């Protein structure tokens, strides 16, 4: 009989934790800011905040003044389509997770997802204890681990069909076979965090007016193993 050749995807953490979903201008999310009519002076003051945690501090100031973040769109149409292919609500879910990661005191993806799940911005029916948000985030992580990248149209094809190898910093090798997908999903879900990339390089983290004079703010998505 024919024995299929199994392909494995490999991530090495030797020399530092590797990224799972890489930042770029293509991974920016745009929000409109409502709830408060910001003056030019306020906008300038917020944009000039230059602390070591300036993105978080700018967001805190926007919220202090009554500003509300309303997700508008992901900046890159291809990346947004890839997200929608995984789940039609994934862009909005990740947008909520992004805002939360810059508001609370954790960057841990599992903790952030659980927090957003508690707030339930999509009003899912939680009567039966179904984990809507966690399931969708896990699907995103699996897709990212197996070949989905931001600016390349993706059709749900996984680049590895056998499993996923993780080379840990101490040289140990973890092997996840796809026939135990839940174990693999949980590994990704429990071992990833969001990371703030360079705001000047990728053009996010400042208040600005769009072409219709609406006040906007961009946040950037990057996921790294922790």
Regions from the language model: what does each represent?
Residues 1-226:
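Short, positively charged
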